[in-house]
Amino acid sequence: MYTDLKDKVVVVTGGSKGLGRAMAVRFGQEQSKVVVNYRSNEEEALEVKKEIEEAGGQAIIVRGDVTKEEDVVNLVETAVKEFGSLDVMINNAGVENPVPSHELSLENWNQVIDTNLTGAFLGSREAIKYFVENDIKGNVINMSSVHEMIPWPLFVHYAASKGGMKLMTETLALEYAPKGIRVNNIGPGAIDTPINAEKFADPEQRADVESMIPMGYIGKPEEIASVAAFLASSQASYVTGITLFADGGMTKYPSFQAGRG
C-alpha cells in the first residue's frame, strides 16, 4: 500500500470492467477518491463504486464516451467539482477486434483509433491542462499494450493505436517534465479480463498463449492494478516517459516477437 495515495483524486476511464475495474478498486483500497467512468453499463459502474467504498475509498460514477471531446471535458470538470481537485488520470478505455487488414473498414479503423488513441489524448490533454493551470505535479497513466512494440496480425488498427500511444506518451512526458507532471504507459501482456474471456475459455487457445509467456501463466487484472498504483505513487517520483511492461516476460519471448499472438 502507498500511504501518499490516500485522498488523491483518481479518474479511471473504462472503469466499470476488466483492468479499469481492478485499478479503480485498487485505488479504493489505497483510500483514494475515485471517479469511475463508464460508457453504457451503469449497473456495473455502481458495483465498482460499492467495492471502492467498501474498501475504504470514496467514489462517484460518470457516464461518458471517451471519443467525444465534450464527454472527456465533463469527466475532468466533474472530478474537480465533486472532489475538489485532480491528481491522477488513467486513460484505460479501449476496444479491439480481429479483422484481416484487407477487409478492415474505415469505420472499424476509426472506432479503434478514436477510442484507444484519441480518447487517451483527450484525457491526457484535459488532465494536463488542469495540472498546468493549478500548478499541480499530476500524473497521467495511459493503458498501452505489448503491441505498442510488437506487430499483431489481424489487429492492425489496435497495434497502430498502441504504437501511436507510445510516442504520444513519450512526447507529453518530455514536454511537461519541467513542470513536474509525469506521463507513463502500462503495457500489459495477456491478462484474464472479459475482453479475453472467450479466447481463454478454450483450453487449447489458453495453453497456446501460456506457452508464449516465460512466467507460464496469464496475468491477473490485480497485477496490472498494482503497477498503476506504483506509477501513481511517490515511489515512482523519478519515473516518466516509459512503458512499464507487465507481461510475464512475453515481449522477450522469441516466438512472440516473430509474430505469434
Curated annotation (Swiss-Prot):
Q: Which UniProt keywords apply?
A: NADP, Oxidoreductase
Any GO MF annotation of the entry: glucose 1-dehydrogenase (NAD+) activity
What does the annotation say about its assembly with partners?
A: Homotetramer.
Q: Which family does it belong to?
A: Belongs to the short-chain dehydrogenases/reductases (SDR) family.
Q: What is this protein called?
A: Glucose 1-dehydrogenase 2
Task: Supply the NCBIfam families for this chain.
Answer: PRK07231.1, PRK08936.1, PRK12826.1-2
Q: What else is known?
A: Prefers NADP to NAD.
The record's listing under CDD domains reads: GlcDH_SDR_c (cd05358)
Q: Which residues bind NADP(+)?
A: 11-35
Question: Which SUPFAM superfamilies has this protein been placed in?
Answer: NAD(P)-binding Rossmann-fold domains
Query: Recorded E.C. number(s)?
Result: 1.1.1.47
Q: Which PROSITE patterns match?
A: ADH_SHORT (PS00061)
Instruction: Report residues binding substrate.
Output: S145
Q: Where is the active site?
A: Y158
